[in-house]
Structures are given as C-alpha cells and as structure tokens.
Amino acid sequence: MGDFFLDAYFDCDPHLNEPSVETGKTAYQVVRTRRQAGAAGTVVANLAALGCHQIDTIGYIGNDGEGFELKRALTGLGADTSHLIVDEGRVTPTYGKPCLVETAKTRAWQVTEELERLDIKNRRPTPARLQTRLIDAAHRCLSAADAVVVVDQVSEPNCGVITTRVRRSIEELAKRHPDKPFVADSRKRIGQFRQVSIKPNLGEAQAALSTSSGRSVAAAGDLLKRLRGRRLRPCFCTLSTRGMVVDDGSGLKHVAAFSVSGPTDPVGAGDSATSVLAIVLGAGGTATEAALTANLVASITVQQIGTTGTATRRQVLQRYQEVDARES
C-alpha cells in the first residue's frame, strides 16, 4: 500500500544528438523507451521476482497515459490491481528518466549516464473521499494478507496515498493485528509511524530525530533504538555497504552486508530490502534472518545498472552458496 510511480526511461544515443533549431540546445535522440513500476511498484516487482503468489496493490493513479502504463506494468508482474483507484482529479506520479546509452556492439544498450530527472507529482492534498476509499481497500485486503508493506514516497505532506489520516488507520489495523507484520518505509516521515516495523536508512533516521550524529554503526544503532521507542515490532536501519542494524527488543544487532565487485547502482535497493523484510517476517522468520536475507538480495540488485533491480529465488540461493563457499 502506498505511492505507486511510473518509472519512464528514455534511452538516448549521444552519437545521434542534434542541435534544436528553436533553442540551440541539445535535442537528445531517444532510441529506446522503458516503462517500469516504481516506488511502491518496485516493492511489487521484488515480491513477484521472489515468488509471492498474491500481491494486492492499494493506491491511486490518474486517468492518463502514465496510469495506463503503470497499471499494465503492475499487471505484467502478476499483481492484483483491483484496489488501484483511478481518480480523475489526480495525475499518475511519474519519474521521467532520460539516460545516455552506449550502443556499440561491445556494450549494446548499456546505460552510461542518467540525466536530469523529470518529476510528475500531485502537489495538492489528497481529497478526503479518496482517502476513505484507500482505507476501505486496506480493510478489505487485510484478512488474506500474510504481511503489509507501506510505502510513503511522496515528500509533500498529505499529497500522496499515506496521508496523516491513512497512516493512523494503518496504525490502528496494525494494533489490532499484532501477529501480522507491517513494514513501513517513508522518505520524509518515518519518525511519525507507530505500531509498525520501520526501515529508515541512516539519513532518514537522522532527519526523523533532527540530529546529525555520526555515521558509525554504533551511532546508527543508537538512532534506531530511539526511533523504536515503545514499538513492539522489530525495526531496521539500512547502512548501504555496511549492511543493516536491527532492534527486535532483545538488543541491537549489526547484520553485515555482502561484498560485491564491479560497478553498482543503489537505485531501488531500499525497496528490495523492504520487500524481503516483509516476506521473511511474514513467513515467520526472525528479524535477524530478515535483515540477512535483505542484505543478500541487495547484493544482487545493486549490480543491475540503469534500472531498478530485482532478484529471483534462484539468484538468492546461488549468491548464498557463493558467500558460504568463500567463507568456508
């Protein structure tokens, strides 16, 4: 449940650049377009790649071309979009991503640079009637769910799916169902979530507590402990190449990342981690097991350049075997 974005990639061949007659600026020549489900859609892509059989999507899109493409992308992943509300008064949130690609034979369609992004977002508050429909959808879907993922992507307060009212409704559902995992990820408001597991990165944790404390693992652990407070659910703080800190109420634990070689692209790594945490917790795993598996998946997705990566169960098992052999 949350903010579903369309990731619209425009791959441009720099060898075909032309000067614009009207402005004299560079007219980039698009040689390929790609449409993917982003933000909460990236979570869906990861859940699908890891073999989840029933994925309900709760959010809204506009009655526009971007909404059509986003819904098609989600359907292509096998997700149920019957609770993805089409609203005439909203636009479909979209990240337009022009990229330079190298099309030489040795590097066919390899992304070499991502240019300035173009954002389409709703900057007016989400109407009350739409919030009511979103809350009703959450109530309908909950009974059949093994876990709930909440993605609060929109920075502008109360302009996305996870408004204050919707967040409080989710918290009430989580309070009523303490045995069902709820995992929340928020770009700007992670400190406002109660009753659910949270997964900030270090910068988000610092912002939530209005502090610029150090970047050490110990400092991150202290931040997470303060954020968890009286929450009864496990909480996580991601540390990029240093892995993740976990607070499950029995003490802080640092779960190290798995090292990778070669170029990496962190786009979507946080969403993949959120997906895995929900899967493992929903299957009855411990918080530490969830963090370890999330780090394992992240070591795969960050090696997928110029796209929001995913990992299959086979890839995860293979990576685990590689790591196990290396450490034996």
Pin down the residues of each PLM region.
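Ribokinase/PfkB-type carbohydrate-kinase core domain
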Residues: 1-18, 25, 29-254, 258-262, ...
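Acyl-CoA/ACP chain-elongation machinery
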Residues: 301
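Short glycine/threonine-rich catalytic loop with a Thr-x-Gly-x-Asp
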Residues: 259-277
